[in-house]
Amino acid sequence: MFLAQEIIRKKRDGHALSDEEIRFFINGIRDNTISEGQIAALAMTIFFHDMTMPERVSLTMAMRDSGTVLDWKSLHLNGPIVDKHSTGGVGDVTSLMLGPMVAACGGYIPMISGRGLGHTGGTLDKLESIPGFDIFPDDNRFREIIKDVGVAIIGQTSSLAPADKRFYATRDITATVDSIPLITASILAKKLAEGLDALVMDVKVGSGAFMPTYELSEALAEAIVGVANGAGVRTTALLTDMNQVLASSAGNAVEVREAVQFLTGEYRNPRLFDVTMALCVEMLISGKLAKDDAEARAKLQAVLDNGKAAEVFGRMVAAQKGPTDFVENYAKYLPTAMLTKAVYADTEGFVSEMDTRALGMAVVAMGGGRRQASDTIDYSVGFTDMARLGDQVDGQRPLAVIHAKDENNWQEAAKAVKAAIKLADKAPESTPTVYRRISE
């Protein structure tokens, strides 16, 4: 039996906590026997004193074990359980292609996703722009879809890592969100509760990233890889670029449209293709579905070329109560904005810099995201045909096409787009889409 205040005192004085102490505290968070003040105090001591790798692993596993951990053995699946997690960005629609692509190559992806957070779009919000799409199937249905289709994308239920929800709510109001051991545990508790064999992390870098600097993004990626492997899940991370909108679109329905076009081959943004392929390659290699980069890429290209990946996406949408002919007729089903009109730069030039965070917030301001949990989303608004870094823009080539609910909405968005995109006399040097791969 431990006392919460003694655990806080021990960490306050700079000592490492034992696995038993950490489990006692996390179980107390779940059971409401630990007060909000005690959660806040421990969070602040961790913020200032950090945690050793064994402490980080213990914290993550205790939070994972505070709820249900999915077990797939009874389904006798003939492939690995794999997933991807992104720290979030703008136009980051990779999950919608990656899940079906990896499933078409023999993986099983029980992806538990989130809503939009701040300037970043949420995979669940995007999928809910599809009429009827059910993000909360019951457990039996979820398992059926995984077995039959190979991929399902659902919302977090209250039974998964419940201690994280309470811990995070307290961190959010006590300035202790940006602590690497706490971020790592929060991300991984939910992911590891999926019962994975392998995980790839997409850690964003740049103006639209969660972490403000390259060094902090790198530190987070290294922490996640170390902790997840310590918890027994084969994990790698990619540091990918978020200095510009990743896809050609940003919003909800507009990104789903781009995802379908990507899968069918109608249109593929080259940077989105690079990042999606790189993440899928990691999943295939970690999941032992391919022995190396070349074999993984060949398999992935094949399921894009032969239509299998698009077919899996269509089957997932139908299995989650969306239209059965969605891939063939997406334009019929996705909501469209009242006003669709391009915005042009005031001068000619080359796109040299993009405040990606500001562009994400502009989508939120249009109604495409939430400022508070109770807000409703306008799924139709957003941007398409986004100019990329290095593009020449003028009276013919717009900065973006804005999908707005009315003229006022369009004007506000146009102002935001112009303010977020800087022009120069010559094109900037191109930056990589993937900066670094991190493994154990």
UniProtKB/Swiss-Prot annotation:
Assigned keywords, A-Z: Glycosyltransferase, Transferase
Record has Transferase as a keyword: yes
The protein's enzyme class: transferase
One Gene Ontology term of the molecular function aspect: 1,4-alpha-oligoglucan phosphorylase activity
GO cellular component, one term: membrane
The UniProt record lists the keyword Transcription regulation: no
Domain of life: Bacteria
Pathway: Pyrimidine metabolism; dTMP biosynthesis via salvage pathway; dTMP from thymine: step 1/2
Database matches in InterPro entries: Glycosyl_Trfase_fam3, Glycosyl_Trfase_fam3_N_dom, Glycosyl_Trfase_fam3_N_dom_sf, Nuc_phospho_transferase, PYNP-like_C_sf, PYNP_C, Pyrmidine_PPas_bac/euk, Pyrmidine_PPase_CS
Reaction equations catalysed: thymidine + phosphate = 2-deoxy-alpha-D-ribose 1-phosphate + thymine
Any one GO BP annotation for this protein: pyrimidine nucleoside metabolic process
Enzyme Commission number(s) from the entry: 2.4.2.4
Subunit structure, interactors included: Homodimer.
Function comment: The enzymes which catalyze the reversible phosphorolysis of pyrimidine nucleosides are involved in the degradation of these compounds and in their utilization as carbon and energy sources, or in the rescue of pyrimidine bases for nucleotide synthesis.
PANTHER family (alphabetical): THYMIDINE PHOSPHORYLASE
Entry similarity comment: Belongs to the thymidine/pyrimidine-nucleoside phosphorylase family.
Protein name: Thymidine phosphorylase
Organism: Escherichia coli (strain K12)
